[in-house]
A protein has these predicted regions:
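Active-site-adjacent substrate/metal-binding segments within catalytic domains
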Residues: 1-57
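Hydrophobic faces of well-ordered beta-strands that scaffold small-molecule active sites
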Residues: 2-8, 43-47, 69-73, 104-108, ...
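Aromatic-rich peripheral "rim/lid" segments of glycoside hydrolase catalytic domains that contact
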Residues: 7, 18, 281-344
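Short, acidic/polar
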Residues: 16-36, 83-94, 174-182, 262-269
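Aromatic-lined substrate-binding rim segments of carbohydrate-active enzymes
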Residues: 32-88, 144-172, 296-300
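Active-site groove signature of glycoside hydrolases
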Residues: 43, 91-149, 172-178, 278-281
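A solvent-exposed, charged loop/short amphipathic helix patch at secondary-structure junctions
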Residues: 122-147, 232-255, 303-312
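Glycoside hydrolase catalytic-domain groove-lining segments
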Residues: 165, 170-250, 266-269, 273, ...
Length: 344
């Protein structure tokens, strides 16, 4: 694959109202980008988050370490107008980066049918996911103004048109496998491709089908959690966390197993190579909002997709500016695979 990538979150809203990264010191971002480039052997990073200034900060650090930037604004639960304005602000930021020589791709949203409000009924991501999975709830009234799919494509066409007036670089969208996107509006086909127990057999064919559009295909996101059985859950592995508890805890006993995650990522990277995919971004580098614990009941890293295992922050200022994580088996597995293609 030409693009060897990983996602990097700069702060995304979580269900309890906080952020996945409460602070984002520049020196810490610089350290982590260096690890991504030099140890993980990435040549690209998909930077996600809601705050444009944080995205720009991380993008600058990534560029200084020779990484291609996939700029991915994400304002979860925003309505169409709020999302539209956020994307246009991102387009202007990307053009500023492009003009100083940075390699930048603008990702105009991620799985908006469930992350943006208004297309599918529901006040939250979880509500909309539940609605999406139950066709019996889809009524004629809901489809009166067009299907969610039709309205999503109309929205994306409008956003892409306006974004091109501000940004002269390539555009894509990070689509869910259930979304039927009109890729004529984009330069790159982007898919969030999680293999699970339900799609395991047809998964290679699902990936292959995206090549029909005649554009480069990039897996914008794929990953696996860190416990026995997580490979069968794919993109829903995070649902095992009890978020009603204070602090959060695992909702049931799990057997932590880093080899499950490492094997899953290796298998999919090999599959993407064999199917001629142009690139892929492993989800994700670090997840500070899912810290580990010596008490298995509170080891949230078990339910994270992170390549590194985060430990809780200390009370001293120094701990806020240095990595509090250790490399998992998945980190080394991805580094080995990407390292094989690490050539000019």
């Amino acid at each position: 694959m030409r693009i060897r990538g990983v996602t990097y979150d700069v702060g995304t809203p979580v269900i309890n109202g906080g952020l996945t990264r409460e602070t984002l010191p520049l020196d810490l971002v610089e350290q982590e980008m260096q690890v991504i480039a030099k140890e993980l052997h990435c040549n690209a990073v998909r930077i996600t988050g809601q705050d444009i200034e944080r995205l720009k900060l991380a993008a600058g650090a990534a560029c200084r370490h020779g990484l291609e930037v996939w700029f991915s604004p994400s304002v979860h639960n925003a309505n169409e107008q709020e999302t539209f304005q956020n994307m246009l602000e991102a387009a202007s930021a990307c053009e500023d980066l492009r003009k100083v020589g940075s390699q930048v791709v603008l990702v105009l949203g991620c799985e908006l049918s469930v992350f943006m409000s208004g297309l599918i009924p529901g006040d939250s991501l979880l509500d909309r996911l539940a609605f999406l999975s139950d066709p019996s709830r889809w009524t004629a009234d809901m489809l009166a103004n067009g299907s969610p799919e039709e309205r999503l494509n109309t929205f994306l066409a409008r956003v892409a048109t306006e974004a091109r007036r501000r940004f002269a670089g390539p555009l894509t969208y990070a689509s869910g496998l259930w979304e039927d996107i009109d890729w004529r509006n984009f330069d790159i086909v982007g898919i969030d491709a999680y293999r699970d127990g339900n799609n395991r057999q047809e998964f290679p064919g699902l990936i292959r089908n995206y090549t029909q559009f005649g554009q480069p295909v990039v897996v914008t996101e794929f990953g696996c959690c860190t416990y026995v059985g997580a490979d069968d859950l794919g993109g829903m592995g995070w649902m095992v966390v009890n978020r009603q508890s204070t602090p959060w805890r695992l909702g049931k006993p799990l057997t932590r197993d880093e080899s499950v995650q490492a094997r899953y990522l290796t298998e999919l990277l090999e599959l993407f190579d064999s199917e001629g995919v142009d690139g892929a971004f492993v989800y994700t580098f670090v997840s500070p909002s899912y810290p580990s614990s010596i008490d298995p009941r509170y080891d949230l890293d078990t339910a994270s997709y992170s390549l590194v295992r985060t430990w809780p922050a200390g009370n001293d200022a120094a701990s806020q500016h240095s990595p509090r994580w250790e490399r998992k088996q998945a980190f080394h597995a991805v580094a080995r695979h990407y390292g094989k293609g690490n050539h000019p």
